C-alpha cells in the first residue's frame, strides 16, 4: 500500500495530499507548505484504488537521526488505521535507510496517537504556522 516516491507523479501526489490537509483544512499558507527540504527528503505515499490517500517524508538530520515530517492522511481515510499503517511504513523506511532515532514536530492534537506508537514528548509546546506543536522522539529498533 505504501511506496517510496521514485518519480515526479508520485511526488505531485504527495503535494496534492499535503495541500488538501495542511493548506485547505488547516489554513497553512500554501507558500510555506512546500519547502527547501523537499529534494533532500525521502517521501512515502499510500494509494487506495489508485487514489493518493496518505503521505509523509523523512529527512536525515545526521548519520543516526531522521526527522519525520508532513504526515498527512486524507479526511476520507481517517479513523481506519491508515495513520498507524503510514507511520509503521515510515519507521520501516527509516530503519531500512540506516537510521536509529526518529524525531518529529507533532501537532498537539495528535500527541495521543504518536504516544500510542511509543513516541515521547520532548521540550515545550511551540507554534508553527499558527498550530501548536511539540517535539516527539522515538528510538527505532527491531522490536517496534
Curated annotation (Swiss-Prot):
Name this protein carries in UniProt: Acetyltransferase SACOL1063
Record InterPro entries: Acyl_CoA_acyltransferase, GNAT_dom, GNPNAT1-like
MF terms in GO: acyltransferase activity, transferring groups other than amino-acyl groups; glucosamine 6-phosphate N-acetyltransferase activity
Homology family: Belongs to the UPF0039 (ElaA) family.
Function: Catalyzes the transfer of an acetyl group from acetyl coenzyme A (AcCoA) to an acceptor substrate and releases both CoA and the acetylated product. It displays the highest activity for L-threonine. It can also use L-tryptophan, and to a much lesser extent L-tyrosine.
Keyword DNA-binding: no
Binding site for CoA: 71-73, 79, 112-114
Disulfide bonds: none
EC annotation from Swiss-Prot or TrEMBL: 2.3.1.-
Organism domain of life: Bacteria
The protein's enzyme class: transferase
Keyword annotations of the record: Acyltransferase, Transferase
PROSITE patterns: GNAT (PS51186)
Recorded coiled-coil stretches: none
N-acetyltransferase domain mapped to chain residues: 1-141
Amino acid at each position: 500500500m505504501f511506496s517510496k516516491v521514485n518519480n515526479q507523479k508520485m511526488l505531485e501526489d504527495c503535494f496534492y495530499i499535503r495541500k488538501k490537509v495542511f493548506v485547505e483544512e488547516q489554513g497553512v499558507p500554501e507558500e510555506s507548505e512546500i519547502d527547501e527540504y523537499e529534494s533532500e527528503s525521502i517521501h512515502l505515499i499510500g494509494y487506495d484504488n489508485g487514489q493518493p490517500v496518505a503521505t509523509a517524508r523523512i529527512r536525515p538530520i545526521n548519520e543516526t537521526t531522521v526527522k519525520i515530517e508532513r504526515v498527512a492522511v486524507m479526511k476520507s481515510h481517517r479513523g481506519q488505521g491508515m495513520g498507524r499503517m503510514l507511520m509503521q511504513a515510515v519507521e520501516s523506511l527509516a530503519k531500512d535507510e540506516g537510521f536509529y532515532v526518529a524525531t518529529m514536530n507533532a501537532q498537539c492534537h495528535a500527541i495521543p496517537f504518536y504516544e500510542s506508537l511509543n513516541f515521547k514528548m520532548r521540550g515545550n509546546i511551540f507554534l508553527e504556522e499558527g498550530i501548536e506543536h511539540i517535539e516527539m522522539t522515538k528510538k527505532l529498533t527491531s522490536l517496534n
